Curated annotation (Swiss-Prot):
This is Uncharacterized cox1 intron-2 37.2 kDa protein. GO terms for molecular function: DNA binding; endonuclease activity. This protein is coded in group-I intron 2 of cox1. GO terms for biological process: intron homing. It comes from the Eukaryota. Keywords: Mitochondrion. It holds the Pfam family LAGLIDADG_1. It is found in: Mitochondrion. One of its GO terms (cellular component) is mitochondrial chromosome. Its main location: mitochondrion.
Length: 323
């Protein structure tokens, strides 16, 4: 006789243990071996039962079951540690607010609050100027030097993700005679990797994201919503973010734009996990801290109290408004 497939009833659910042909020829000699095997499988089931249970639950419930709480301790704020990390951050920043112009320049726009970030970018690249735009709360970081443009392209190659920036480099930079030799030394490519385990999203968010806290009063019940939002003309980058962080994508017909929002508490947790590891460098970091603190209050259900709600409503001491 052969023992070809073993099933057992565990925690009220029938679990299929052997999907492959694990067979034991029956004999008195190996009866003990079969018994040991069954015991080991039972132990494995007891360890993995929680994971298997999650397959049948909704995303919200699954998050409640498995999500480890966000720590009240804030990680030390760090900048990218090397050219590779900085290249990912710069690629995200350029994908969001950068432009390779027909004058063979790189131009990145910043809010006037982020002038220190503009000078940091200049220092890391080693080229460029920072220029204030008259009568506007904006500044420009501009690189016109050939060596500076070449360094930027080397830094972001295989790290940036937008086809528009790829086409700008091909048509506005490589097509110009002074970059002819450089274009022969580099194989330009987009980052097609689907994970976000680098600084790209931090740079992209410093350019285009906002951290929103919405307090709603519905049927005499207070509801606090945390929304990390990004608006784009194209949907594909938002789909990448959604695949990694959860959330939803919408479309505004009147503006012909798509928007991503981290609408659930579980998605907010994933947003925090990312930005606690890959830090924002602009003034949006202050907005993120306020947003993160609101999450901690909700996490402990303190938003249901007057004191907790007042803490969420309180302006951040270092900034009056949330981006």
């Amino acid at each position: 006789n052969l023992i070809g497939l073993l099933t057992l009833l565990y925690a009220g659910t029938t679990w299929k243990i052997l999907d492959k042909s694990f067979c034991f020829k029956y004999s008195k000699k190996n009866t003990r071996l079969v018994f040991i095997f069954i015991v080991k499988m039972l132990k494995q089931l007891s360890i993995s039962a929680g994971n298997l249970l999650n397959k049948g639950t909704s995303e919200t419930l699954r998050n409640e079951i498995t999500t480890k709480k966000v720590s009240i301790h804030l990680p030390k704020h760090l900048k990218p540690a090397n050219d590779s990390q900085f290249g990912h951050y710069l690629a995200g920043l350029i994908d969001g607010d950068g432009h390779f112009s027909s004058k063979q320049q790189l131009i990145i726009a910043f809010h006037s609050l982020d002038i220190q970030l503009a000078y940091y970018i200049k220092k890391q690249i080693g080229y460029g100027i920072v220029r204030k735009i008259k009568d506007k709360n904006a500044i420009l970081f501009i690189i016109a030097n050939s060596k500076g443009i070449e360094r930027v392209i080397t830094l972001i190659n295989n790290k940036f993700r937008t086809t528009s920036k790829y086409n700008q480099i091909i048509n506005n930079i490589f097509a110009h005679p002074r970059f002819k030799e450089f274009s022969k030394t580099i194989t330009l490519g987009l980052n097609s990797n689907n994970n976000l385990n680098n600084h790209w999203l931090a740079g992209f968010s410093d350019a285009d994201a906002s951290f929103q806290i919405k307090i709603l009063n519905r049927d005499k019940k207070i509801e606090v919503r945390l929304n990390y939002q990004i608006d784009q003309k194209k949907e594909y980058l938002l789909s990448l973010i959604k695949d990694n962080l959860g959330g939803n994508i919408g479309y505004r017909k009147s503006q012909d734009t798509y928007y991503y929002g981290s609408t659930s508490f579980g998605s907010a947790k994933k947003v925090i996990n990312y930005f606690d590891n890959y830090h924002l460098l602009s003034s949006k970091y202050i907005s993120y801290l306020k947003w993160r603190k609101a999450y901690l209050i909700i996490q402990e259900n303190k938003h249901l109290t007057e004191s907790g709600l007042s803490q969420i409503k309180k302006p951040h001491p270092y900034r009056k408004n949330i981006n």
